[in-house]
UniProtKB/Swiss-Prot annotation:
It comes from Nitrobacter hamburgensis (strain DSM 10229 / NCIMB 13809 / X14). Keywords: ATP-binding, Cytoplasm, Kinase, Magnesium, Metal-binding, Nucleotide metabolism, Nucleotide-binding, Phosphoprotein, Transferase. This is Nucleoside diphosphate kinase. Major role in the synthesis of nucleoside triphosphates other than ATP. The ATP gamma phosphate is transferred to the NDP beta phosphate via a ping-pong mechanism, using a phosphorylated active-site intermediate. It is found in: Cytoplasm. The keyword Nucleotidyltransferase does not apply. The active site is at H117 (pros-phosphohistidine intermediate). InterPro entries: NDK-like_dom, NDK-like_dom_sf, Nucleoside_diP_kinase.
Length: 140
């Protein structure tokens, strides 16, 4: 099994409800290490760049507005098959369809306010990590 890194964001709905510790506990229980973490307020430009892949979708503006509505926690996670493992513990985008015990089943309030983002591939993770962290901020 390969040791990988993936990128995670605890979204404004999660930080507003002080869920950082609870979500981090689920991440660590799944065997992933948090090797970088910081609480930030995304700028509109950062959010638009980060979600540029969705620019043509009807929900893009609402997504950007949500992501800049409050603080987020950006993270780099490390572990065996980190991308897949993190996606499994996040659960389905729609919390009503998420498996029991997943972050979204436990904490998300809707499809839009689903508490967490996770990279979908190692290549995507590398790009997303570089958008928010410099090399010396990642201590693995």
């Amino acid at each position: 099994m390969a040791i990988e890194r993936t990128f995670s964001i605890l979204k404004p709905d999660a930080t507003a409800r002080n869920l950082t510790g609870a979500i981090n506990a689920l991440i660590e229980k799944a065997g992933l290490r948090i090797v970088a973490q910081k609480r930030i307020r995304m700028t509109r430009e950062q959010a638009e760049t980060f979600y540029a892949v969705h620019k043509a979708r009807p929900f893009f503006g609402e997504l950007v507005d949500f992501m800049i509505s409050g603080p987020v926690v950006v993270q780099v996670l490390e572990g065996e098959n980190a991308v897949l493992k993190h996606r499994e513990i996040m659960g389905a985008t729609d919390p009503s369809k998420a498996a029991d015990g997943t972050i979204r089943k436990l904490h998300a309030t809707s499809v839009g306010e689903n508490s967490v983002h996770g990279s979908d591939a190692t290549e995507t993770a590398a790009v997303e990590i570089a958008q928010f962290f410099s090399g010396n901020e990642i201590v693995g």
